């Protein structure tokens, strides 16, 4: 199904008009579809592949659906690459890649020469961490238990290779903006010679949205450079990269941007590129060459070439504030009825500044990785609900729930019913 810009705007406008005609809404989405307008979201959902099936899908944090027209653009790019191979790749593709880069930079709020592409955020994070040149023997680097697992490993490896002091902050068990800032502030104050700080904006474990702008300012005042992982927050929350006041950032385009799997980006503040060594395969790269920090080699170019189509569709049909309001509303549909259920720990509070789509839970006495894999297996096999376990938090493993844009209210109701049945049966202590 092809949707022109005019058709997309008409669709959004018609849905918004319908929302405005309704008597009351749980949340507001000015100029768009109200978060609880199921009919309006169904119309948008018709522009995507059908989600109908025997399993209730509540694990949308891995990657996002492409809209049908984006998938068609991706297919056309795959077919062109397959048909024209090196004639296109060596003679014409570079011009198209420059257009893609400019469009990506525009969405990020930065300049094209400040960004590079990678296949996923983990790849970009590995490069920026392991190749960071601003840490010497006796210096310190800092991260938290909520950061991505492979980033933990990269930070430890950086500390070991440079004989630096590794400092990991355990975030509060019931996180709020205030106590998370306080935890980082205390760690920063207590850490002499701090040179490098990793912050995750939207955590993939609990779902906490960390106030990175405030924390980055504290870290920079202490003399550290700051890397922000916004893989789970880009285009789910309204921001541009410079808002963070950081030196580096990494994000995914295949989560909440709706691009094909296999396209992500990273940003380096102007003037900071020499602080990251080029990839080993790029020994002759200029220090200011951002893309040279990740050597791409030959890869599937179709996802990158499709990125402008995904960004255009999102901006025309799914503005970020409208998207966020929907995801938070869906999250609240399952969280609110389960607050206070004996044996169940909802890991985030209800301040909208601290969550997006993701919120995780624990069942009392089940804190090991094996425990939480078993819970996700039970939810899948017995209740036909898809979730995922997450491990690595200081207080133990958990189960992550991530509604998608076209999750239905009834899907959240099924999870509520399942946990009300399951938790009393297996909670310990």
Predicted regions and their residues:
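N-terminal secretory signal peptides and thylakoid transit peptides that target proteins
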Residues: 1-15
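Conserved N-terminal alpha-helix of the aminotransferase class I/II PLP-enzyme fold
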Residues: 84-123, 327
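Structural signature of PLP-dependent enzymes
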Residues: 89, 291-336
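Conserved PLP-anchoring active-site segment centered on the Schiff-base-forming lysine
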Residues: 113-114, 132-152, 371
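Active-site phosphate-binding strand-loop segment of PLP-dependent enzymes
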Residues: 176-231, 235
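Active-site PLP attachment segment
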Residues: 244-286
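Conserved PLP-binding catalytic core of the aspartate aminotransferase-like
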Residues: 325-382
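PLP-dependent enzyme catalytic core of the Aspartate aminotransferase-like
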Residues: 368-369, 377, 381-387, 391-429
């Amino acid at each position: 199904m092809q949707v022109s810009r005019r058709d997309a705007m008409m669709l959004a406008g018609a849905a918004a008009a319908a929302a405005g005609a309704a008597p009351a809404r749980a949340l507001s989405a000015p100029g768009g579809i109200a978060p609880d307008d199921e009919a309006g979201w169904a119309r948008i959902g018709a522009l995507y592949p059908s989600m109908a099936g025997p399993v209730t899908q509540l694990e949308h944090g891995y990657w996002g659906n492409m809209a049908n027209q984006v998938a068609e653009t991706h297919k056309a790019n795959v077919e062109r690459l397959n048909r024209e191979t090196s004639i296109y790749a060596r003679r014409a593709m570079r011009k198209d890649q420059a257009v893609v880069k400019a469009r990506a930079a525009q969405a990020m709020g930065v300049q094209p020469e400040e960004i590079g592409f990678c296949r996923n955020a983990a790849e970009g994070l590995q490069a920026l961490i392991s190749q960071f040149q601003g840490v010497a023997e006796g210096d310190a680097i800092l991260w938290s238990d909520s950061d991505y697992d492979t980033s933990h490993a990269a930070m430890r490896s950086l500390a070991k290779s440079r004989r630096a002091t590794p400092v990991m902050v355990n975030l509060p068990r019931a996180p709020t903006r205030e106590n998370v800032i306080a935890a980082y502030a205390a760690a920063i104050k207590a850490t002499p010679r701090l040179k490098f700080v990793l912050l995750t904006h939207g955590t993939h474990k609990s779902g906490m949205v960390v106030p990175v702008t405030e924390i980055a300012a504290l870290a920079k005042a202490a003399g550290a450079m700051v890397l922000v992982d916004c893989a789970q927050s880009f285009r789910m929350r309204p921001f541009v990269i410079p808002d963070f006041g950081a030196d580096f950032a990494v994000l995914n385009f295949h989560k909440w941007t709706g691009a094909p799997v296999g396209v992500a980006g990273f940003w380096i503040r102007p003037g900071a590129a020499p602080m990251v060594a080029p990839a080993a395969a790029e020994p002759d790269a200029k220090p200011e060459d951002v893309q040279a920090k990740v050597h791409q080699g030959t890869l599937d170019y179709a996802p990158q070439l499709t990125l402008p189509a995904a960004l255009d569709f999102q901006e025309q049909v799914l503005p970020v504030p409208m998207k966020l309001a929907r995801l938070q509303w869906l999250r609240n549909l399952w969280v609110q009825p389960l607050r206070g259920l004996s044996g169940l720990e909802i890991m985030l509070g209800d301040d909208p500044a601290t969550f997006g789509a993701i919120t995780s839970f624990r069942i009392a006495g089940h804190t090991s990785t094996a425990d939480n894999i078993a819970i996700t297996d039970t939810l899948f096999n017995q209740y036909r609900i898809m979730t995922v376990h997450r491990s690595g938090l200081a207080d133990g493993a958990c189960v992550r729930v991530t509604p998608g844009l076209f999750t239905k209210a009834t899907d959240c109701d099924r999870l509520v019913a399942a946990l009300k049945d399951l938790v009393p049966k297996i909670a310990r202590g």
